[in-house]
Amino acid sequence: MSLSSKLSVQDLDLKDKRVFIRVDFNVPLDGKKITSNQRIVAALPTIKYVLEHHPRYVVLASHLGRPNGERNEKYSLAPVAKELQSLLGKDVTFLNDCVGPEVEAAVKASAPGSVILLENLRYHIEEEGSRKVDGQKVKASKEDVQKFRHELSSLADVYINDAFGTAHRAHSSMVGFDLPQRAAGFLLEKELKYFGKALENPTRPFLAILGGAKVADKIQLIDNLLDKVDSIIIGGGMAFTFKKVLENTEIGDSIFDKAGAEIVPKLMEKAKAKGVEVVLPVDFIIADAFSADANTKTVTDKEGIPAGWQGLDNGPESRKLFAATVAKAKTIVWNGPPGVFEFEKFAAGTKALLDEVVKSSAAGNTVIIGGGDTATVAKKYGVTDKISHVSTGGGASLELLEGKELPGVAFLSEKK
């Protein structure tokens, strides 16, 4: 599946069409108050573009939180409708459900050019296909799922997906539309453009930077990237498993992943066969407890980490080594911070690496930050707009980097 050959919103004739946009309005709420409207703001370019092309109406649909297939006011999209209305400077009609005769009647009766936001898709078990009852998974019937998908499809002539964060889920609103044209919105298109370039046609040298605690969780990721990259930096907690297995470094009480340890030699063998340079930290900031105010010191890998101490960040020599590796690269994909950046004492390694990739991006290289923790780092230090691309989807970007096909992307029409 090529990521760069999918139909775009710009390929569509939208005049007088009934347009359905699957957006990602899964915003953080404090009661009924939205604490960050970033996801709503991110969807505006696609919504505005569609409105400028005079559709019959625009129907927006999203999930919010995990209501587990039933109505729960806590997860209502009503506050989002208000926020969207003020951001768009245009009336937004909020409907109390996402399917059913009342929804169909309200949509049909809407004025030309209306913007309609449906209630949370996940109030219906048919969106995800199952729900948890007393810890057990209960599946929706095939007939009910088909009916739900048919009801959503019947609201539209054209389907646009702009929810990259959910693209790795084969949910009804992602793969259930029986419509001839299924296109990517601007947000999704940008994700596909950057990941497509890196994974299908990178400017070399291509560097992957990986963090995270467990090797076992990242096996598929490392294995797939070894087929594509020229070098790989391994930081974070999983570096200790590599150091212990490969160099017999004393790692004290640092994270050691037994299951992952068995795979390390295989991964290194593959790296060697493919000519991929694997860069590991050579010194550590260690702590006598996993806490923000622990005692700290710096040790080299030769000295090792004493019992009762654990590594929570890479040290100054590692930072220099990583900086030199970043400086050589023309394409960089970063997934996972190298240290416990949430604690100020152990954030320096992450901050130093961030400074280097910002520099690389400023020099015109392609730098992609996978969603999740690494995106949080970019946001924390206010550099999101100084990086070529910060992904909006943690799980979805990880699955792309693992070489998996995303159902929500595979479902889109191909460009003619």
UniProtKB/Swiss-Prot annotation:
Pfam families: PGK (PF00162). The modification N-acetylserine is found at S2. There is a cross-link at K82, K197, K258, K274, K302 (Glycyl lysine isopeptide (Lys-Gly) (interchain with G-Cter in ubiquitin)). ATP binds at A213, K214, K218, G237, G311, L312, N335, E342, D373, T374. One of its GO terms (biological process) is glycolytic process. It catalyses: (2R)-3-phosphoglycerate + ATP = (2R)-3-phospho-glyceroyl phosphate + ADP. Pathway: Carbohydrate degradation; glycolysis; pyruvate from D-glyceraldehyde 3-phosphate: step 2/5. Keywords: Acetylation, ATP-binding, Cytoplasm, Glycolysis, Isopeptide bond, Kinase, Magnesium, Metal-binding, Mitochondrion, Nucleotide-binding, Phosphoprotein, Transferase, Ubl conjugation. Its main location: cytoplasm. GO terms for molecular function: ADP binding; ATP binding; metal ion binding; phosphoglycerate kinase activity. Its cofactor is Mg(2+). Changing R22M: 7-fold reduction of Vmax. Mg(2+) binds at A213, A216, D217, D373. CDP binds at G212, D217, G236, G336, F341. Present with 314000 molecules/cell in log phase SD medium. Belongs to the phosphoglycerate kinase family. Catalyzes one of the two ATP producing reactions in the glycolytic pathway via the reversible conversion of 1,3-diphosphoglycerate to 3-phosphoglycerate. Both L- and D- forms of purine and pyrimidine nucleotides can be used as substrates, but the activity is much lower on pyrimidines. Negatively regulates the biosynthesis of acetyl-CoA from pyruvate in the mitochondrion. This is Phosphoglycerate kinase. It comes from Saccharomyces cerevisiae (strain ATCC 204508 / S288c). The gene is PGK1.
